[in-house]
Amino acid sequence: MFDISSSNLLISVLVVLFAKQLINAVGKATLENIGWSAYCKVAPKLGDSKFIALDQKNVELAKVSKERKSISAQDQYARWTKLNRQFDKLTGEINKLKEETSASRSYISKYIGYMILVTTTLPIWFFRVWFRKAVLFYFPTGVLPHYLEWFLALPFITTGGVGLTIWMSAVNNVVSSVIFLVKFPFEKEVPFPSKEVGNEKTSINKEEVSGTPAAN
């Protein structure tokens, strides 16, 4: 049962760990926002009455807002006032519908959490337990020092082989480093401390040492 070749096991572990690190890099909160946005687009097509009403109200609000902006409050005050009341009413109804539909967001977040658990966490633990004694590959005798061969065989296999525990640790570190290198150029730059901030800190330090306010 669950008999799998070493090469397939290597690839399977690599895929699962890559998916895990990619999810960590993107962030669970980002995935939840993407899932919620997708659900908001699909829900009206699935017949969810609240989302259908929310879409209709948003269309009406956009129409009223456009019409209100196209007229002058001074020249057509009565019409502008009427449109303004409609705008306020629609805004209130939309906010109420958003509060009602927000309950669905917790379910979406829960399902996304389950998907992450099923696709990454559970497979990793399954591999660790079920294939803990599997030898993925062997090093030729004498290639590595004996103490290193012994370490790579930890904790369940014979000296000279590489087991799943060491392999998963190595792959996890490599994938994490690669993702970090890919993300790094796109990270926001940390601004240098301004000269004013530096002068302010210097003044504070002088006050602490001398006990008198520093001259500006």
Swiss-Prot record:
GO biological process, one term: tail-anchored membrane protein insertion into ER membrane
Coiled-coil ranges (or none): 54-105
Cytoplasmic face residues: 30-116, 179-216
Segments of skewed composition (Basic and acidic residues): 197-209
Transmembrane segments: 10-29, 117-137, 162-178
Keyword terms, alphabetized: Coiled coil, Endoplasmic reticulum, ER-Golgi transport, Golgi apparatus, Membrane, Transmembrane, Transmembrane helix, Transport
GO terms for MF: protein-membrane adaptor activity
Main location: endoplasmic reticulum
Stretches for region Disordered: 193-216
A Pfam match: CHD5
InterPro entries: Get1 (IPR028945), Get1_fungi (IPR027538), Helix_hairpin_bin_sf (IPR029012)
HAMAP family noted in UniProt: Get1
Function, as annotated: Required for the post-translational delivery of tail-anchored (TA) proteins to the endoplasmic reticulum. Together with GET2, acts as a membrane receptor for soluble GET3, which recognizes and selectively binds the transmembrane domain of TA proteins in the cytosol. The GET complex cooperates with the HDEL receptor ERD2 to mediate the ATP-dependent retrieval of resident ER proteins that contain a C-terminal H-D-E-L retention signal from the Golgi to the ER.
Subunit structure: Component of the Golgi to ER traffic (GET) complex, which is composed of GET1, GET2 and GET3. Within the complex, GET1 and GET2 form a heterotetramer which is stabilized by phosphatidylinositol binding and which binds to the GET3 homodimer.
Protein name, as recorded: Golgi to ER traffic protein 1
